[in-house]
Regions:
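Detector for methionine-enriched segments
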Residues: 1, 50-54, 76
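Compact, glycine-rich, soluble single-domain proteins
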Residues: 8-55
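Intrinsic-disorder/low-complexity, polar/charged segments enriched in Ser/Thr/Lys/Arg/Asp/Glu/Gln
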Residues: 2-6, 62-64
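C-terminal structural segments of small proteins and small subunits
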Residues: 55-80
Length: 80
């Protein structure tokens, strides 16, 4: 199963180190489900702290989050 949603960054510091770490830790908890984050033409594996930070997503930016795998619904709910 694949779920894709467009989400807006609401953290006033954007997807900075702490927020990226929380998302990476969450993604690592889903062994059989891939979580990816896209901003414009750049894509990050949510398991990679560096990939997430390199997106440079700031407050108000829209990102596309995709979950793929048997726990896609649960993973998307956790991200949202």
């Amino acid at each position: 199963m694949t779920i894709t949603r467009t989400l807006q960054i609401v953290n006033k510091k954007g997807l900075h180190a702490r927020a990226s770490r929380k998302l990476a830790e969450l993604a690592l908890g889903y062994d059989n489900t891939r979580i990816s984050v896209r901003k414009e033409s750049d894509e990050a594996d949510a398991r990679s702290l560096m990939d997430l930070m390199m997106l440079g997503a700031g407050i108000g930016d829209e990102v596309e989050v995709e979950t793929l795998g048997p726990q896609a619904e649960e993973a998307m709910a956790a991200v949202e």
